[in-house]
C-alpha cells in the first residue's frame, strides 16, 4: 500500500487542514518540517509520494501552480487537487497526477479522461451532491479515471481513526485503484486500510505527531 504525504496550500504556505474548516487553517510550522514554505517543506521531509490541495484555487482566489510544479520535481508522483472544473482545466507537468474532486468537478464526470477522482465527503455524504459514498464509487466504475480517492474531509486533521465496516463497503464498491485520506491516526489504522484492500493512504497529522515513522513516508510504502 502506498503512503502519500498530504499537505494543503493557502496564501503561499503549507497549512494544517482540519475538518475542512478552511478559514481557520494555520501555517504548518510545528511538525516534521521547520518551514511552511511549499518547496522547503517537501525538501525537508523528502516523501516519495505527495498529495497537494491548492485551497486558493479550489476556492477561486488564487493559484500555486508554480510552487506545485517545483514540488512535483522532488517526488516520484504528485497527486494534485487544484479545483479542476473542466477537462481542459488540468495542470501539465513532470510527475503530476491531476485530481478531479467532486467539490468542483461538476456533475458529468464521464467527460474526464485520466487522472484521479476524489470523492469528497462531509458528514458521510459526497459533496455537493449528497450521495452515499459507496454508491458514488460504484458509479465511478463506468468512468475513465486511473483511480479514486475517498477523502473524508470531516476527519481531516483530527486523527479520529477509521471505521473498518465503512471501509469494507467502500472497497467493495470500486474495483480500481483506491486511496483513502482523512483521520488516519496511527499504524493500526494503516494496517486496517491495507488489510481491507486499499491501494494507498494519504496522511499528514499522524506523521507530524510521530504516530507514523517519517522513513515510511520517505520509502512510500506500508507493509503489514
Segments predicted by a language model, with ranges:
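N-terminal active-site wall of soluble small-molecule enzyme domains
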Residues: 38-94, 164-166
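Surface-exposed amphipathic alpha-helices with a cationic face
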Residues: 68-75, 109-110, 167-173, 194, ...
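Glycine-rich phosphate-binding active-site loops on the catalytic face of alpha/beta enzymes
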Residues: 83-109, 152-157, 182-216
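Active-site/ligand-binding-proximal alpha/beta "capping" segment
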Residues: 139-179
Amino acid at each position: 500500500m502506498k503512503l502519500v504525504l498530504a499537505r494543503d496550500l493557502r496564501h503561499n504556505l503549507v497549512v494544517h487542514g482540519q475538518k475542512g474548516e478552511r478559514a481557520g487553517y494555520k501555517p504548518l510550522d510545528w511538525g516534521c518540517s521547520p518551514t511552511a514554505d511549499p518547496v522547503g517543506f517537501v525538501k525537508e521531509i523528502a516523501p516519495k509520494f505527495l498529495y497537494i490541495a491548492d485551497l486558493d484555487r479550489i476556492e477561486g482566489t488564487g493559484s500555486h501552480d508554480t510552487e506545485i510544479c517545483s514540488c512535483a520535481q522532488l517526488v516520484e508522483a504528485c497527486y494534485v487537487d487544484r479545483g479542476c472544473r473542466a477537462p481542459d482545466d488540468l495542470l501539465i507537468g513532470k510527475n503530476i497526477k491531476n485530481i478531479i474532486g467532486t467539490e468542483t468537478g461538476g456533475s458529468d464526470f464521464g467527460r474526464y479522461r485520466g487522472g484521479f477522482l476524489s470523492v469528497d465527503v462531509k458528514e458521510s455524504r459526497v459533496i455537493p451532491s449528497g450521495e452515499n459514498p459507496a454508491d458514488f464509487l460504484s458509479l465511478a466504475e463506468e468512468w475513465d479515471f486511473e483511480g479514486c480517492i475517498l477523502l473524508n474531509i470531516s476527519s481531516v486533521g483530527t486523527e479520529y481513526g477509521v471505521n473498518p465496516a465503512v471501509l469494507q463497503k467502500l472497497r467493495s464498491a470500486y474495483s480500481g485503484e483506491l486511496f483513502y485520506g482523512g483521520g488516519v491516526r496511527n499504524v493500526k489504522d494503516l494496517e486496517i486500510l491495507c488489510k481491507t484492500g486499499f491501494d494507498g493512504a494519504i496522511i499528514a497529522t499522524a506523521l507530524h505527531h510521530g504516530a507514523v515513522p517519517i522513513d515510511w513516508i520517505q520509502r512510500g510504502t506500508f507493509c503489514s
